[in-house]
Amino acid sequence: MNQEIMNLFNPTTPAQVFDQIRISIASPEKILSWSYGEIKKPETINYRTFKPERDGLFCARIFGPIKDYECLCGKYKRMKYKGIICEKCSVEVTLSRVRRERMGHIELAAPVAHIWFLKSLPSRIGLLLDMTLKDLERILYFEYYVVLEPGLTALKDRQLLSEDEYLKAQDEYGQDSFTAMIGAEAIRELLKGMDLEKLEASLRVEMQETDSDIKHKKLAKRLKIVEAFRHSGNKPEWMIMTVVPVIPPDLRPLVPLDGGRFATSDLNDLYRRVINRNNRLKRLMELRAPDIIIRNEKRMLQEAVDALFDNGRRGRVITGANKRPLKSLADMLKGKQGRFRQNLLGKRVDYSGRSVIVVGPELRLHQCGLPKKMALELFKPFIYSRLDAKGLSTTVKQAKKLVEKERPEVWDILDEVIREHPVLLNRAPTLHRLGIQAFEPVLIEGKAIQLHPLVCAAFNADFDGDQMAVHVPLSLEAQLEARVLMMSTNNILHPANGQPIIVPSQDIVLGLYYVSIMREGLPGEGKIFGDMAELEHALHAKVIHLHTKIKYRWQGMDETGKVSTRWIETTAGRVMLGNLLPKNPRISYEIINKLMTKREISGVIDQVYRHCGQKETVIFCDRIMALGFYNAFKAGISFGKDDMVVPHGKWKIVDTTRTLAKDFEQQYNDGLITHGEKYNKVVDAWSKATEEIAKAMMKEISATKKTASGADADINSIYMMAHSGARGSPAQMRQLAGMRGLMAKPSGEIIETPIISNFKEGLSVLEYFNSTHGARKGLADTALKTANSGYLTRRLVDVAQDCIITQDDCGTKLGIKMRAIVDAGTVVASLGSRILGRTACEDVRDSSGKVIIKRGTLMEESHLDAIHQGGVQEVKIRSALTCELVNGICGKCYGRDLARGTPVNHGEAVGVIAAQSIGEPGTQLTMRTFHIGGAAQLNEQSFVESNFDGKIVIRNKAIARNSEGHLIAMVRNMVVAIVDADGTERATHRIQYGSRLHVDEGDTVKRGQRIVEWDPYTRPLLTEVEGTIGFEDLVEGQSISETLDEATGIAKRVVIDWRSTRGGSDLRPAIVVKGKDGKVLKLARGGDARYMLSVDAILSVDIGAKVAPGDILARVSTESAKTRDITGGLPRVAELFEARRPKDAAIIAEIAGTIRFGRDYKNKRRISIEPMDKTDEPREYLIPKGKHIHLQDGDVVEKGDFIVEGNPAPHDILAVKGIEELAAYLVNEIQEVYRLQGVLINDKHIEVIVRQMLQKVEVTDQGDTDMISGEQVDKIEFDALNEKAKEEGKKIATGTPVLLGITKASLQTRSFFSAASFQETTRVLTEAAVNGKVDPLEGLKENVIVGRLIPAGTGASMAKIREVAMKRDKLILDEREKQAAVVSPAPEAELPALPPAE
């Protein structure tokens, strides 16, 4: 009885406790064990009584009562009859909730195939039986018989027979001499009769014997599925169903609408079809109907079951009454609207509201303004409870009334309730974790939420109508997490790069910039002030100006913490700013005693955060915000038309460029340059002109003008806005007052005629049209970009979601080397910036060999100076890529938590942070693919200047002096280095083939001196020997054509594709250099002086011409060598993460050796490499014709050199150079795209993602393990199996790492939940079921899906505590068992001492 009473108040059944979930194929017995009864009728509910029909789809006898504790006929009502089964209507008296849990079943009259195992590729049934899908369908859909048992006849096992052949065979051999069947029964018999163990053994033998690659792959696939069935305990015949489960009725409800109609779930329709056809089939079989009718009915039953499980996978989609496809069971799970993504991974929550946001400049950083109306609604339950506690109301109803009337005491209580109760603000789209932050609410009038201006950058919010959502954390734990982890004051640094994100912008920056200006010659210059009061007095009395240069007695703090005083030259404005700085010995006045631009302010905030901590930083930020706003208002900076100054020299520059463009046109007409070259040169000239005009304009605008009295005049307002970083950029100013410049077409090409006017002068009609042309594409791009960027983020999160910091140190000795990234001679990422916050993997030594940083040290800002001064060129650091933990990453390999500036904590979800950091700036990236030629990424570099003073050192030197007396680079791998006085290398430049050097080995250079230059638009072919020119196989009309440029009538000789001309297939066009005797000269490196020509080469020499080494024989315009598009922006990032092979992939030399040209095929050229290492095999490469090969016979290549230029395929880099090189390549390429947009992302984020892409190993030799060579195995699994083999003394397997794209890697994670909720749900679940996969619930997604705390953050520590508790429980239970075993009435043994808590 007591139990019953207890149940009254606690009707919930305890949740199942589990730590793994397994998925497998359900056997017919299993389905029957779930079922509470068979459904025999297709009826749902009675149209008059609205009660469910007996044995129908909603039957109360099978599924349970409709009302709580009430049977259908109403004989038994209420709790006291709980558990009784009514004798009249056979309904159990219980909770109606069981209708959500109880299942039914349908006994099928004929077996049917489960469509997922039949049609989901690869077809599992087909693989097991080794039959094609086409044949299977012919059997299943009753077209062909299949021979099961040929007996003594001439038929073969599993031979297909058509109706006629079957009858003929019966006539010929007699009815019982062989067995052949048709339909699902036949397949079921075949599957039932399989001996998997025997099959596995024979497949293994066959695999060892076969030589064919294709056959090996096919056998491996089959072997894998056979093993899967053997190990999972699934039986193959279960893929053919004899019983169909029916899901509980409340999960496919029938809802009455007003007007007496019903809305029903599509599943009911689908089940109805199955039941109808099944019943009809039963009746026909009882009636002994003709075979043809029964067969047709069986086929229809198969189709009905197919539609129920996966509508539209086979045949046409079954539609409902309104021509809409019915939603089958598979559709319930699939896609954005499916169960996984709609309800399990994304839920709507209560206690939330949303409203428009407005600016709240008087708020503190940790506050937000919450409208009273919203607060009242959100905190209602809290208010009710307080009213009750204070005795102001006795019932909830009374409290409700009080609140509705908005009585004064309610407002007082609301104040109490929200005090120190943080709320979460969220702005969609939440692209990174800073899109949700916690604030303390401040009650305000009005209906809009007030937001602090400094957090706008993190939310990416502005006040043009943005809305934000408010969520209330209810439980104490939630409030604690909100306050400790999510409070806006805790999110000062950006997780992507560790820079401050609480940075003033726009008017604040403008105000601070204005405050910090210093001008010469203003009243009161040179006056001396002792303290702030004097200064303010003087300002009010207008004795001095805010910008006057003055002397001030500054009180700072020295190293000991004592106050120190000194005189400084500054301005009144800067003193105001200095007074806001926290007092700290490491923070000097100098950091603000300069013109404060946005960048400078960010630097100051960073310094304050590093030296003074979070609290001081927050106070400082609030103060400078107030100062900035106030002074922006005081300054009265405006935007006037006269502030846009059109430079005086504009038209002169325009005219010169016009003449230049005319010259190029003329050169083209004279045939000196090609059309492509002319286009490039014209575009270049106009780019330069635009730049020059912009420079002239900036010079005029930024120049300090003098007033009549000789003082500095006010600075130009527009210049102030752009220079301070408040709004606008030099590029926009150029369009306002310089010239608009070149415009792009929607295709990305650049229009040759520029827009010469600017917006101040106004555009002509033609110019206006040209400018709208490209701008429209920009808008269309933006819309596409958002979707694409979101999808990239989703894939990244999915691949990295289970990357969590699980330990402090994995103890690995591995790491990756970091160097500064130098692009075209300028350092784009210094060594210091790349290793900050990472752990040293080895001792770092300076150039003298002294250890300056010990291994295992986390690099702080202080270490960077030591590295810089020590002249260290590269540092080996720990990386996520080389971390040896099985699950997750260790803290040492990850390094510093960028958002906190401290070593990373346990349980930090670094994978998700990495994904967000890379995905969030995705919307800022461009979408376009650049076509070469055009100012989009022009300013092609054509020279290198020295950035340092020093001496020249040349490595791999090969220089020739050509007939004009210039030094020419003759090899591709020559490097020029600049070494300073100490012998430290300051810069290295790789020199292009054919470049002209201005310096030689040992020369001294000054900073800014030109070292080399080259023609960026052509690739030359140079001779290495002196002699006379001869031609080989250059036949007019076959391999060479004198093309007359149609515009000019001037001839130039171009090599044409000789293989496509008649009789030209055997030609090998070349230029040879002959000696005095008329014979072809020999080269020093071996081989003849014969230079093969590629298609589109333009000859620069004639027969009989004299040449010197280094002279150009022919040139290939890079137009044709480089017509490939440069994929830029988002598509490039996606391409790299997906590890796609680029369209024109570079061909990489797998070994070091000598190039040899072999015999050519019809449309391929054969190149082989003779290895240096004689034990190696030579490698052959086939290269499509028309590809420009810049190597000659006899050239020496290193391992990893490019044989054909292009983007290398990441897989090739991994295969040839290994993981470290691959990581370096991917990190640099991805960073380059982001760098172009000025987005900073720390390398470690990209490394985390790349680590996830390298989780698989391809087995090359299976050894004595169960693995199959050629299959891809998880690294962890691979190591585990090898360990096992080692212990047993067997031969271990070998494998090579494989690079998977992020989509593929997500689908191949160990967790099937995670993969199924990502993409291709059916395929993933089918495969998981066949393999009987177990999901260990280790990642974040799986745990969210099953409704648990995620194993990261606070969830990780909870998991740890739970683990300890379970260990202790086990100890106690074991001890109890021991005591129970000792039956003797001895005194109870002491309980064991508990292990100390971890």
UniProtKB/Swiss-Prot annotation:
Biased composition (Low complexity): 1380-1392
Cofactor binding: number and manner: Binds 1 Mg(2+) ion per subunit.
One GO CC term on file: DNA-directed RNA polymerase complex
Positions that bind Zn(2+) 1: 71, 73, 86, 89
One Pfam assignment: RNA_pol_Rpb1_4
Keywords, ordered alphabetically: DNA-directed RNA polymerase, Magnesium, Metal-binding, Nucleotidyltransferase, Transcription, Transferase, Zinc
CDD domains: RNAP_beta'_C (cd02655), RNAP_beta'_N (cd01609)
UniProt GO BP: DNA-templated transcription
Reaction catalyzed: RNA(n) + a ribonucleoside 5'-triphosphate = RNA(n+1) + diphosphate
Necessary cofactors: Mg(2+); Zn(2+)
Recorded GO MF terms: DNA binding; DNA-directed RNA polymerase activity; magnesium ion binding; zinc ion binding
Record: residues binding Mg(2+): 462, 464, 466
Residues that coordinate or bind Zn(2+) 2: 810, 883, 890, 893
Region (Disordered) residue spans: 1377-1398
Domain of life according to the entry: Bacteria
EC numbers for this chain: 2.7.7.6
Database matches in InterPro entries: DNA-dir_RpoC_beta_prime, DNA-dir_RpoC_beta_prime_bact, RNA_pol_asu, RNA_pol_N, RNA_pol_Rpb1_1, RNA_pol_Rpb1_3, RNA_pol_Rpb1_3_sf, RNA_pol_Rpb1_4
Function: DNA-dependent RNA polymerase catalyzes the transcription of DNA into RNA using the four ribonucleoside triphosphates as substrates.
Record HAMAP family: RNApol_bact_RpoC (MF_01322)
Similarity annotation: Belongs to the RNA polymerase beta' chain family.
Subunit field text: The RNAP catalytic core consists of 2 alpha, 1 beta, 1 beta' and 1 omega subunit. When a sigma factor is associated with the core the holoenzyme is formed, which can initiate transcription.
Protein name: DNA-directed RNA polymerase subunit beta'
Organism: Bradyrhizobium diazoefficiens (strain JCM 10833 / BCRC 13528 / IAM 13628 / NBRC 14792 / USDA 110)
Upper lineage: Bacteria, Pseudomonadati, Pseudomonadota, Alphaproteobacteria, Hyphomicrobiales
Gene this protein is translated from: rpoC
